[in-house]
Structure formats: structure tokens, C-alpha cells
A protein has these predicted regions:
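Residue-level signal for short amphipathic helical patches enriched in basic/charged
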Residues: 54-57, 110
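Hydrophobic membrane-insertion alpha-helices, especially the h-region
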Residues: 9-25
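Cys/His-rich metal-chelating microdomains
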Residues: 65-68
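Extracytoplasmic electron-transfer domains, predominantly the class I c-type cytochrome c fold
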Residues: 70-136
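Short, Lys/Arg-rich N-terminal segment immediately upstream of the first membrane anchor
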Residues: 1-6
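Short cysteine clusters
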Residues: 59-62
Length: 136
């Protein structure tokens, strides 16, 4: 039985919607990759390795971070939008050096705060900073 014009029109519309969805998904992936590259350039670190460190160091035990399932803690502040904040811990200007320092040795910056010092190299702290910046 031949297809009616209505069926052909519906078929073409469905194909157009699928093509649009694929294009939108591709643009989102490209935007995420661009954000990660920009974050790595700013922080001088490797965001992919920073994501591994985020899990290994147990950051999600105290903090939440959208898109990271193991980040469900309620002790520390949410880490969404760290790259958009003006200050770190309400005391330090938000720049890669200060964020990396805060990650490594928060007790030196604000003695007695709830965040423990995290033994790691300066490069590892830059990698973790790049990961946080890459999340927005």
C-alpha cells in the first residue's frame, strides 16, 4: 500500500527531529570539551586526572558536585560553579594558585576549618583544580 502524503510528512518530521537532537547533543559535547580545555589551560592541570583524584581523595564524602554521582556529602559547600566564584573560603581570590593551595592545605589558610589538609603534590592539586574549574 503506497504511503500517503501525511505519512511521508510525519516520517520527514521525525527524521528532522532526530537530526536536531543529534546536533544538539554534539554541540553540548563540544562545549563540555571546550570548557575542560579552557580549565586545564587556566589551572595548568589535567582535568581528567583531577576527576580521578576527586574520587580517590574522597571529596564527594563532604561535597556535592552535579554530574558526579559519588559526590553526595553534606559537610562542605557544594562545588558547583567553583570557577565562577570570586572568593575561595571567603578569604582568597579565586585563581588557580589559590584554589590549588586551598585544596592541599586548607588548615594553613583557615586554621580549624572542617576541611582536612590533603597530602598531594602541587601538580595533583592543580589537576584537581582543573577538574573543578571544568565543571563550571
Amino acid at each position: 500500500m503506497p504511503w500517503s502524503r501525511t505519512r511521508v510528512s510525519i516520517f520527514i518530521a521525525v527524521l528532522a527531529l532526530i537530526a536536531a537532537a543529534i546536533a544538539i547533543y554534539g554541540n553540548q559535547q563540544g562545549a563540555r570539551q571546550e570548557l575542560q580545555q579552557r580549565a586545564e589551560a587556566i589551572a595548568g592541570g589535567n582535568a581528567t586526572h583531577g576527576q580521578v583524584l576527586f574520587a580517590e581523595k574522597g571529596c564527594g564524602g563532604c561535597h556535592t558536585l552535579k554530574g558526579v554521582t559519588q559526590a553526595a556529602g553534606l559537610v562542605g559547600p557544594p562545588l558547583d560553579g567553583v570557577g565562577q566564584r570570586a572568593m575561595i573560603a571567603g578569604m582568597l581570590a579565586n585563581n588557580p594558585d589559590n584554589l590549588a593551595r586551598w585544596i592541599r592545605e586548607p588548615q594553613t589558610v583557615v586554621p580549624g576549618n572542617a576541611m582536612p589538609n590533603l597530602p598531594m603534590s602541587k601538580q595533583d592539586s592543580r589537576d584537581l583544580a582543573a577538574f573543578l574549574y571544568s565543571k563550571g
